[in-house]
Amino acid sequence: MELPVKVGSNSPIYAADRLNLRVKHVDRLSSLLSNFSLHASTFYSGGFCGVAAYPGDVPRGYVHLLRAGRVTLGSSHGEGVVIDEPSLMLMGRPLAHRVSASDEDGAELVCATIEFDGGVDNPLSRALPEYLLLPLSAVPSIAGAIDWLFSEAFGDDCGREAVLDRLFELMVIQLLRHLMASNQLSGGMLAGLANPRLSKAMTLMHDAPAKPWSVADLALAANMSRASFAAQFREVVGMTPADYLVSWRVSLAQKRLREGRPIALIADEVGYESPSALARAFRRKVGASPREWVQRLA
């Protein structure tokens, strides 16, 4: 039997735990990144001339940083946008695109691939916009990381590749902070984490997915009535709190399955009383059983 996500007023959380639900501050990103870490790999830095095409059928994203000059960013459909000021181009998940420049454009680029643990099933990757194009002047909060990154990319210090990879990872995390702080997200998980009240409830689910969280518990953490909390959660995140908890649990299960963990242990870790209960939730979300899903990865 699948462990229910309770929605009634009688919470299964102990009273002592309930007293701790009104948290004053939560780290909205660390619990995500500790479960689904980010990996960057720098593959180009220097003057750029020509056309570079990137496929959309590989499980990775891309970051392109324009330090100087001009490039054209195009899609697989042929449209293109000219970028003629220092800018950041982020494809957080697979997206076919191309970057082009002529000799006269004087383009200087630094490029990296980005991969989240879990690939395209990673909730952070799914939550990001399909692509972001931002002038660097519009994101002053990441200026320090960008300046350091450019200094490494166009220098010749030893260990530069390792430093560049870490700086790209730092930059993406700072960019996530910027997106949540600037209210540029129309909906989804990151928009929920950007909401001061909803983020408290979401972080509880992220930190302790095995607990049978009720709407009453989560509303208490958000300092809202149950009805207001449930309505606002659905409006901002795009699903009910119960459905979000199931989605988060399944995402964690996918990560652990990739690591080769046995499903019996995974079920207990993510809040299900049996492997069959997890398998039912998994099939509803993914369209396949855990065994079938793992076989597809092979």
What are these regions (language model features)?
Residues 4-20, 26-40, 95-154, 172-184:
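A hydrophobic/aromatic-rich effector-binding and dimerization subdomain
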Residues 86, 229, 233, 277-278, ...:
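Short hydrophobic/aromatic patch on the recognition helix
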Residues 203, 207, 212-219, 224, ...:
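Terminal helix-turn-helix DNA-binding modules in bacterial transcription factors
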Residues 40-130:
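N-terminal regulatory/effector-sensing and dimerization cores
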Residues 91, 192-195, 292:
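Basic, helix-initiating cap at the start of DNA-binding domains
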